[in-house]
Protein backbone atom coordinates (compact mmCIF):
# COMPACT_ATOMS: atom_id res chain seq x y z
CA UNK A 1 0.00 0.00 0.00
CA UNK A 2 2.72 2.28 0.77
CA UNK A 3 4.73 1.56 -2.31
CA UNK A 4 1.84 1.39 -4.69
CA UNK A 5 1.98 4.63 -6.64
CA UNK A 6 5.73 5.14 -6.24
CA UNK A 7 7.93 4.97 -9.30
CA UNK A 8 10.72 2.36 -9.49
CA UNK A 9 13.61 4.81 -9.70
CA UNK A 10 12.61 6.58 -6.46
CA UNK A 11 12.31 3.30 -4.57
CA UNK A 12 15.82 2.34 -5.57
CA UNK A 13 17.17 5.66 -4.27
CA UNK A 14 15.53 5.13 -0.90
CA UNK A 15 17.04 1.70 -0.54
CA UNK A 16 20.53 2.98 -1.26
CA UNK A 17 20.16 5.73 1.32
CA UNK A 18 19.04 3.27 3.98
CA UNK A 19 21.98 0.99 3.22
CA UNK A 20 24.41 3.89 3.51
CA UNK A 21 23.00 4.94 6.86
CA UNK A 22 23.21 1.42 8.22
CA UNK A 23 26.91 1.21 7.31
CA UNK A 24 27.68 4.52 9.03
CA UNK A 25 25.89 3.41 12.19
CA UNK A 26 27.80 0.13 12.34
CA UNK A 27 31.10 1.99 11.91
CA UNK A 28 30.22 4.36 14.78
CA UNK A 29 29.35 1.45 17.05
CA UNK A 30 32.75 -0.16 16.42
CA UNK A 31 34.50 3.12 17.26
CA UNK A 32 32.64 3.41 20.53
CA UNK A 33 33.50 -0.15 21.44
CA UNK A 34 37.21 0.43 20.75
CA UNK A 35 37.24 3.53 22.88
CA UNK A 36 35.64 1.57 25.67
CA UNK A 37 38.30 -1.11 25.50
CA UNK A 38 41.10 1.50 25.54
CA UNK A 39 39.79 3.26 28.65
CA UNK A 40 39.21 0.08 30.57
CA UNK A 41 42.62 -1.38 29.92
CA UNK A 42 44.35 0.08 33.12
CA UNK A 43 41.75 -1.55 35.34
CA UNK A 44 42.50 -4.99 33.97
CA UNK A 45 46.27 -4.48 33.68
CA UNK A 46 48.43 -6.91 35.68
CA UNK A 47 50.41 -4.03 37.53
CA UNK A 48 50.79 -4.23 41.39
CA UNK A 49 48.16 -2.11 43.22
CA UNK A 50 49.30 0.87 45.46
CA UNK A 51 49.49 0.37 49.23
CA UNK A 52 48.57 3.01 51.84
CA UNK A 53 51.55 4.19 53.93
CA UNK A 54 49.26 4.63 56.92
CA UNK A 55 47.30 1.41 57.22
CA UNK A 56 49.26 -0.74 54.76
CA UNK A 57 46.19 -1.89 52.82
CA UNK A 58 45.52 -1.52 49.09
CA UNK A 59 44.19 1.78 47.82
CA UNK A 60 41.03 1.09 45.83
CA UNK A 61 39.48 4.52 46.28
CA UNK A 62 39.02 6.84 43.35
CA UNK A 63 41.13 9.55 45.07
CA UNK A 64 44.17 9.23 47.29
CA UNK A 65 46.82 11.54 48.85
CA UNK A 66 50.51 11.75 47.97
CA UNK A 67 52.76 12.96 50.84
CA UNK A 68 56.48 12.35 51.50
CA UNK A 69 56.58 10.35 48.23
CA UNK A 70 54.01 7.89 49.61
CA UNK A 71 50.35 7.17 48.93
CA UNK A 72 47.79 7.58 51.68
CA UNK A 73 44.11 6.97 52.15
CA UNK A 74 42.24 10.20 52.84
CA UNK A 75 41.39 8.93 56.29
CA UNK A 76 44.92 7.70 57.09
CA UNK A 77 46.91 10.94 56.72
CA UNK A 78 46.71 12.46 60.19
CA UNK A 79 48.99 14.00 62.88
CA UNK A 80 50.62 11.40 65.09
CA UNK A 81 50.33 13.70 68.14
CA UNK A 82 46.86 15.23 68.10
CA UNK A 83 45.31 12.85 65.49
CA UNK A 84 44.17 15.82 63.41
CA UNK A 85 43.11 14.80 59.87
CA UNK A 86 45.36 16.53 57.36
CA UNK A 87 43.34 15.86 54.18
CA UNK A 88 42.10 19.48 54.13
CA UNK A 89 45.31 21.11 55.44
CA UNK A 90 47.65 22.93 53.11
CA UNK A 91 50.83 21.67 54.78
CA UNK A 92 52.04 18.77 56.85
CA UNK A 93 55.44 17.97 58.36
CA UNK A 94 57.39 14.72 58.56
CA UNK A 95 60.09 13.87 61.10
CA UNK A 96 61.70 10.44 61.49
CA UNK A 97 58.89 8.80 59.53
CA UNK A 98 56.09 10.42 61.56
CA UNK A 99 53.58 12.94 60.30
CA UNK A 100 52.87 16.11 62.32
CA UNK A 101 50.58 19.05 61.96
CA UNK A 102 52.06 22.54 61.91
CA UNK A 103 51.39 23.34 65.57
CA UNK A 104 52.81 20.11 66.95
CA UNK A 105 55.85 20.25 64.71
CA UNK A 106 56.82 23.76 65.84
CA UNK A 107 56.07 22.84 69.42
CA UNK A 108 58.44 19.88 69.37
CA UNK A 109 61.10 20.71 66.82
CA UNK A 110 61.15 24.51 66.48
CA UNK A 111 64.57 26.15 66.82
CA UNK A 112 63.28 29.13 68.83
CA UNK A 113 61.26 28.49 71.94
CA UNK A 114 59.42 30.89 74.20
CA UNK A 115 61.45 31.62 77.34
CA UNK A 116 58.26 31.64 79.45
CA UNK A 117 56.20 28.65 78.27
CA UNK A 118 59.07 26.81 76.51
CA UNK A 119 56.89 26.11 73.47
CA UNK A 120 57.95 26.55 69.87
CA UNK A 121 57.53 29.83 68.02
CA UNK A 122 56.48 29.74 64.40
CA UNK A 123 58.19 31.86 61.79
CA UNK A 124 55.06 33.91 61.10
CA UNK A 125 54.23 34.64 64.75
CA UNK A 126 54.80 38.04 66.39
CA UNK A 127 57.22 37.87 69.31
CA UNK A 128 58.73 40.08 72.02
CA UNK A 129 62.50 40.11 72.52
CA UNK A 130 64.32 40.93 75.75
CA UNK A 131 68.10 40.53 75.75
CA UNK A 132 68.72 37.07 74.25
CA UNK A 133 65.27 35.68 75.06
CA UNK A 134 62.20 35.46 72.83
CA UNK A 135 58.63 35.45 74.14
CA UNK A 136 55.15 34.99 72.79
CA UNK A 137 53.11 38.16 72.98
CA UNK A 138 50.82 36.54 75.53
CA UNK A 139 53.76 35.22 77.57
CA UNK A 140 55.59 38.55 77.93
CA UNK A 141 54.06 39.43 81.31
CA UNK A 142 55.27 40.46 84.77
CA UNK A 143 56.23 37.49 86.92
CA UNK A 144 54.67 39.07 90.03
CA UNK A 145 51.40 40.61 88.84
CA UNK A 146 50.98 38.98 85.37
CA UNK A 147 50.59 42.40 83.78
CA UNK A 148 50.96 42.20 80.01
CA UNK A 149 53.89 44.32 78.86
CA UNK A 150 53.62 46.02 75.50
CA UNK A 151 55.94 48.08 73.36
CA UNK A 152 57.13 51.17 75.24
CA UNK A 153 56.59 49.79 78.75
CA UNK A 154 59.51 49.81 81.20
CA UNK A 155 60.51 46.45 82.59
CA UNK A 156 63.41 44.74 84.33
CA UNK A 157 64.87 41.24 84.22
CA UNK A 158 66.29 39.15 87.03
CA UNK A 159 67.42 35.55 86.33
CA UNK A 160 65.57 35.57 82.97
CA UNK A 161 62.34 36.54 84.74
CA UNK A 162 60.49 39.62 83.55
CA UNK A 163 59.14 42.19 86.03
CA UNK A 164 57.21 45.39 85.51
CA UNK A 165 58.84 48.62 86.61
CA UNK A 166 57.11 48.83 89.99
CA UNK A 167 57.87 45.27 91.07
CA UNK A 168 61.43 45.41 89.74
CA UNK A 169 62.20 48.55 91.76
CA UNK A 170 60.70 47.01 94.88
CA UNK A 171 62.77 43.88 94.26
CA UNK A 172 65.99 45.89 93.97
CA UNK A 173 65.22 48.02 97.02
CA UNK A 174 64.48 44.93 99.07
CA UNK A 175 68.09 43.78 98.67
CA UNK A 176 69.36 46.74 100.68
CA UNK A 177 68.70 47.63 104.28
CA UNK A 178 65.91 50.09 104.71
CA UNK A 179 67.07 53.54 105.93
CA UNK A 180 66.73 54.22 109.63
CA UNK A 181 63.55 55.98 110.68
CA UNK A 182 65.04 58.60 112.99
CA UNK A 183 61.64 59.86 114.07
CA UNK A 184 60.67 56.38 115.23
CA UNK A 185 64.01 55.86 116.96
CA UNK A 186 63.67 59.20 118.69
CA UNK A 187 60.22 58.25 119.98
CA UNK A 188 61.56 54.98 121.35
CA UNK A 189 64.86 56.27 122.70
CA UNK A 190 63.70 59.54 124.17
CA UNK A 191 65.30 61.78 121.59
CA UNK A 192 67.93 61.17 118.95
CA UNK A 193 70.07 63.68 117.17
CA UNK A 194 71.93 63.04 113.95
CA UNK A 195 75.71 63.24 114.16
CA UNK A 196 77.58 65.75 112.11
CA UNK A 197 81.13 66.00 110.81
CA UNK A 198 83.62 68.77 110.20
CA UNK A 199 82.66 70.85 107.23
CA UNK A 200 79.85 68.51 106.22
CA UNK A 201 76.89 70.64 107.22
CA UNK A 202 75.66 73.68 105.37
CA UNK A 203 76.88 77.06 106.53
CA UNK A 204 74.29 78.97 108.49
CA UNK A 205 73.63 82.42 107.13
CA UNK A 206 73.31 85.39 109.43
CA UNK A 207 73.59 85.30 113.19
CA UNK A 208 72.67 81.98 114.79
CA UNK A 209 69.99 81.83 117.40
CA UNK A 210 71.04 82.06 120.99
CA UNK A 211 68.73 79.25 122.05
CA UNK A 212 68.95 75.89 120.36
CA UNK A 213 66.55 72.99 120.56
CA UNK A 214 67.60 70.19 122.91
CA UNK A 215 68.11 67.84 119.96
CA UNK A 216 70.70 70.16 118.44
CA UNK A 217 72.39 71.18 121.64
CA UNK A 218 75.94 69.98 122.30
CA UNK A 219 77.06 69.41 125.84
CA UNK A 220 80.62 70.24 126.77
CA UNK A 221 81.99 69.47 130.21
CA UNK A 222 85.63 70.25 129.62
CA UNK A 223 85.25 73.94 129.05
CA UNK A 224 86.89 76.15 131.68
CA UNK A 225 86.81 79.89 131.84
CA UNK A 226 90.55 80.02 132.40
CA UNK A 227 93.29 78.84 130.07
CA UNK A 228 96.20 76.68 131.17
CA UNK A 229 99.23 77.13 128.93
CA UNK A 230 100.46 73.57 129.63
CA UNK A 231 97.23 71.74 128.70
CA UNK A 232 95.35 71.39 125.42
CA UNK A 233 91.59 71.88 125.51
CA UNK A 234 89.33 69.19 124.01
CA UNK A 235 85.89 69.76 122.56
CA UNK A 236 83.57 66.80 123.01
CA UNK A 237 81.38 66.91 119.95
CA UNK A 238 78.89 64.32 121.05
CA UNK A 239 75.29 65.41 120.84
CA UNK A 240 72.47 64.20 123.03
CA UNK A 241 73.18 60.70 124.31
CA UNK A 242 72.01 57.87 122.11
CA UNK A 243 69.74 55.15 123.40
CA UNK A 244 71.51 52.47 125.43
CA UNK A 245 71.16 49.97 122.61
CA UNK A 246 73.28 52.12 120.28
CA UNK A 247 76.96 52.50 121.01
CA UNK A 248 78.65 55.34 119.19
CA UNK A 249 82.21 56.46 119.35
CA UNK A 250 82.72 59.96 120.72
CA UNK A 251 84.25 62.45 118.33
CA UNK A 252 86.59 64.90 119.99
CA UNK A 253 88.44 67.87 118.61
CA UNK A 254 91.68 69.01 120.20
CA UNK A 255 92.59 72.69 120.20
CA UNK A 256 96.06 74.11 120.26
CA UNK A 257 97.01 76.79 122.76
CA UNK A 258 96.90 79.71 120.35
CA UNK A 259 93.53 78.55 118.97
CA UNK A 260 92.03 78.33 122.44
CA UNK A 261 93.42 81.73 123.45
CA UNK A 262 91.99 83.34 120.32
CA UNK A 263 88.51 81.86 120.78
CA UNK A 264 88.27 82.65 124.51
CA UNK A 265 89.53 86.17 124.01
CA UNK A 266 87.00 86.89 121.32
CA UNK A 267 84.27 85.31 123.47
CA UNK A 268 85.06 87.89 126.13
CA UNK A 269 84.26 90.55 123.53
CA UNK A 270 81.43 88.96 121.54
CA UNK A 271 79.51 85.89 122.67
CA UNK A 272 77.68 85.34 119.39
CA UNK A 273 79.81 85.91 116.27
CA UNK A 274 78.09 86.06 112.93
CA UNK A 275 79.02 84.23 109.74
CA UNK A 276 81.54 86.85 108.69
CA UNK A 277 83.25 86.77 112.07
CA UNK A 278 83.34 82.97 112.02
CA UNK A 279 84.94 83.03 108.60
CA UNK A 280 87.71 85.37 109.77
CA UNK A 281 88.17 83.35 112.96
CA UNK A 282 88.49 80.21 110.83
CA UNK A 283 91.24 81.86 108.80
CA UNK A 284 92.98 82.99 111.96
CA UNK A 285 92.82 79.70 113.88
CA UNK A 286 92.80 77.19 111.03
CA UNK A 287 89.57 75.59 112.31
CA UNK A 288 86.37 75.05 110.40
CA UNK A 289 83.42 77.36 110.85
CA UNK A 290 81.36 74.46 112.17
CA UNK A 291 83.86 73.71 114.93
CA UNK A 292 83.99 77.37 115.89
CA UNK A 293 80.21 77.59 115.94
CA UNK A 294 79.98 74.56 118.24
CA UNK A 295 82.64 75.90 120.57
CA UNK A 296 80.91 79.29 120.93
CA UNK A 297 77.58 77.56 121.48
CA UNK A 298 78.99 75.51 124.34
CA UNK A 299 80.80 78.52 125.73
CA UNK A 300 77.54 80.48 125.87
CA UNK A 301 75.84 77.59 127.68
CA UNK A 302 78.68 77.43 130.21
CA UNK A 303 78.53 81.18 130.68
CA UNK A 304 74.77 81.15 131.32
CA UNK A 305 75.15 78.42 133.93
CA UNK A 306 77.79 80.45 135.75
CA UNK A 307 75.55 83.52 135.76
CA UNK A 308 72.58 81.52 137.08
CA UNK A 309 74.67 80.10 139.90
CA UNK A 310 75.75 83.56 140.95
CA UNK A 311 72.18 84.87 140.81
CA UNK A 312 70.98 81.96 142.99
CA UNK A 313 73.36 82.88 145.79
CA UNK A 314 76.26 80.67 144.81
CA UNK A 315 74.34 77.35 144.84
CA UNK A 316 74.92 75.09 141.89
CA UNK A 317 71.68 73.39 140.91
CA UNK A 318 73.47 70.51 139.28
CA UNK A 319 75.53 69.25 142.22
CA UNK A 320 74.28 71.40 145.12
CA UNK A 321 77.74 72.83 145.90
CA UNK A 322 78.09 76.35 147.20
CA UNK A 323 80.20 79.00 145.59
CA UNK A 324 81.99 81.69 147.54
CA UNK A 325 79.76 84.74 148.07
CA UNK A 326 80.43 87.78 145.97
CA UNK A 327 82.56 90.57 147.36
CA UNK A 328 80.74 92.98 149.68
CA UNK A 329 82.60 95.94 148.28
CA UNK A 330 80.51 96.03 145.12
CA UNK A 331 77.22 94.35 144.31
CA UNK A 332 77.98 94.04 140.62
CA UNK A 333 80.81 92.80 138.52
CA UNK A 334 83.00 95.45 137.01
CA UNK A 335 83.83 95.24 133.33
CA UNK A 336 87.46 95.28 132.29
CA UNK A 337 88.99 98.66 131.86
CA UNK A 338 90.43 98.03 128.43
CA UNK A 339 89.50 95.73 125.58
CA UNK A 340 92.02 93.21 124.40
CA UNK A 341 92.30 92.51 120.67
CA UNK A 342 93.08 89.19 119.03
CA UNK A 343 96.32 90.55 117.70
CA UNK A 344 97.48 91.27 121.22
CA UNK A 345 96.27 87.90 122.48
CA UNK A 346 98.50 85.99 120.13
CA UNK A 347 101.49 87.70 121.72
CA UNK A 348 102.72 85.57 124.67
CA UNK A 349 103.99 88.60 126.51
CA UNK A 350 100.50 90.00 127.06
CA UNK A 351 98.30 88.64 129.79
CA UNK A 352 95.38 86.55 128.56
CA UNK A 353 91.93 87.23 129.84
CA UNK A 354 91.12 84.25 132.07
CA UNK A 355 87.53 84.93 132.96
CA UNK A 356 84.61 85.38 130.62
CA UNK A 357 82.21 86.23 133.42
CA UNK A 358 83.81 89.56 134.25
CA UNK A 359 82.54 91.23 131.08
CA UNK A 360 78.87 90.96 131.96
CA UNK A 361 76.94 92.61 134.76
CA UNK A 362 75.09 89.98 136.76
CA UNK A 363 71.96 92.15 136.76
CA UNK A 364 72.15 93.15 133.08
CA UNK A 365 70.28 90.88 130.67
CA UNK A 366 71.75 92.45 127.53
CA UNK A 367 74.79 91.17 125.67
CA UNK A 368 78.11 93.07 125.72
CA UNK A 369 78.97 95.48 122.92
CA UNK A 370 79.56 93.78 119.58
CA UNK A 371 82.99 94.04 118.03
CA UNK A 372 83.65 92.79 114.52
CA UNK A 373 86.67 90.81 113.52
CA UNK A 374 87.52 93.38 110.91
CA UNK A 375 88.56 95.76 113.65
CA UNK A 376 90.30 93.07 115.67
CA UNK A 377 92.50 91.92 112.86
Curated annotation (Swiss-Prot):
Residues 365-377 have a biased composition (Polar residues). Residues 248-307 bind DNA. Residues 333-346 have a biased composition (Low complexity). The keyword Zinc applies. One of its GO terms (molecular function) is DNA-binding transcription factor activity, RNA polymerase II-specific. It is found in: Nucleus. Residues 50-111, 112-174 form the LIM zinc-binding domain. One of its GO terms (biological process) is dorsal spinal cord interneuron anterior axon guidance. SMART domains: HOX (SM00389), LIM (SM00132). InterPro entries: HD, Homeobox_CS, Homeodomain-like_sf, LIM_Homeobox_TF, Znf_LIM. Residues 228-249, 309-346, 358-377 are annotated as: Disordered. The keyword Nucleus applies. It comes from the Eukaryota. Pfam families: Homeodomain (PF00046), LIM (PF00412). GO terms for cellular component: nucleus. Keywords: DNA-binding, Homeobox, LIM domain, Metal-binding, Nucleus, Repeat, Zinc. May be involved in gonadal development. PANTHER family: LIM/HOMEOBOX PROTEIN LHX, LIM_HOMEOBOX PROTEIN LHX9. This is LIM/homeobox protein Lhx9. It comes from Psalidodon fasciatus.
